[in-house]
Curated annotation (Swiss-Prot):
Free-text note on domains in this protein's UniProt record: Has three domains with a flexible linker between the domains II and III, and assumes an 'L' shape. Domains I and II are responsible for tetramerization and subsequent octamerization. The flexible linker plus domain III (residues 129-191 in this study) interacts with RuvB.
Chain ranges for the short sequence motif Acidic pin as given in the UniProt record: 54-55
UniProt name for this protein: Holliday junction branch migration complex subunit RuvA
One Gene Ontology molecular-function label: four-way junction helicase activity
Protein's GO biological process: DNA recombination; DNA repair
Amino acid sequence: MIRYLRGLVLKKEAGGFVLLAGGVGFFLQAPTPFLQALEEGKEVGVHTHLLLKEEGLSLYGFPDEENLALFELLLSVSGVGPKVALALLSALPPRLLARALLEGDARLLTSASGVGRRLAERIALELKGKVPPHLLAGEKVESEAAEEAVMALAALGFKEAQARAVVLDLLAQNPKARAQDLIKEALKRLR
């Protein structure tokens, strides 16, 4: 099992990227926020999950063990494949996704592409209370600026859950960000 690779980002493609490691180019599928953060020509370490399917081997890459653990937890639900798991990790920051799973918040899970009400309810039911505590560590408390940014994004027509997820992720990176900065960066991610 390949659990970690370090190498050069050779090329970014739709839904994944090619990582040159040890003279071999590996294609890794990855969540959208991770893909957007990657730069071609830069070295990166990637936590991986290798999946054997009828069509062959598929490799999935994540920026940290937290994302990888959530991906594997989601795959444990019947009816959830790698495409849905990646969609959830692309739509919601890891800590918000972990919180939604812990609390069984199916409504928040439906903000991911390809996750309908029934599937969200199944995920929420099967994983409610099963999220390891370390995935919730370091949760950030929302600020007034974050709440203002979420309301502004909702007024612009974005789903509140999706806007909140992106704003919380941005706030985790910069806890002192002002509302207008959060809105500006969130718009880049949401478009």
